[in-house]
A protein has these predicted regions:
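Rossmann-like dinucleotide-binding cores of NAD(P)H-dependent redox enzymes
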Residues: 43, 51-108
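Short, Asp-centered acidic motifs that coordinate Mg2+ and/or phosphate
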Residues: 2, 99, 130
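Conserved beta-strand-loop-beta-strand element in the redox core of flavoprotein oxidoreductases
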Residues: 1-3, 110-125
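Short, acidic, Ser/Thr-enriched surface-loop or helix-capping motifs
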Residues: 95, 120, 158
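FAD-site-proximal beta/loop scaffold in flavoenzymes
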Residues: 20-41, 125-166
Length: 166
């Protein structure tokens, strides 16, 4: 017998994920909420330069938004691709007007009137109208915790792709 365990995933959250104007992008409802924020001449801060963050930034630039991308690594797509390929993505975002803040993280996001103030780990801060969290996903494995299956950021598998621990 064969059983496929497709756990799914949810957007990784931060302490400020519930601040109005801060968005995640994982579901159609998330996309619909974010779409209302995509307005020309407004400023979007994108936290994370992986696939979700890079695509959201590109879309925001297309509609005429000012975009700042914040990424703790030295280049976008750093967890999925090498620095050279990430550099190509960075160049394209720069060509289209994005401000890139690499090698720095966000310490805090707080409302300031109708805008959001982002405090960064390098001591700088700036304001944006909306924020997108593109900082990865969390695998939905909680329901497997008492199953005996070995978990480590997902289901641990052996060389034959069989779950370890059962």
């Amino acid at each position: 017998d064969i059983l496929v365990i497709a756990t799914g995933a949810r957007a990784r959250r931060t302490p400020w994920a519930t601040v109005p104007g801060v968005h995640v992008l994982r579901t159609r409802d998330d996309a619909d909420r974010l779409r209302t924020e995509l307005v020309a001449d407004r400023h979007m801060a994108v936290i994370g330069a992986g696939f979700i963050g890079a695509e959201a930034a590109a879309t925001a630039l297309t509609v005429g938004m000012h975009v700042t991308i914040i990424e703790p690594l030295d280049a976008p797509m750093g967890r999925a691709m090498n620095t050279e390929v990430g550099g190509i993505f960075a160049d394209k975002h720069r060509e289209h007007g994005a401000e890139l803040r690499f090698g720095v993280s966000v310490e805090d996001v707080a409302p300031t009137g109708s805008r959001l103030r982002l405090a960064l780990t390098d001591g700088s801060a700036f304001e944006a109208d909306t924020v997108l969290l593109g900082i990865g996903a969390v695998v939905n494995t909680e329901w497997l915790e008492s199953s005996g299956i070995t978990l480590d950021n997902g289901v641990v598998c052996d060389a034959r792709l069989a779950a370890v621990g059962v």
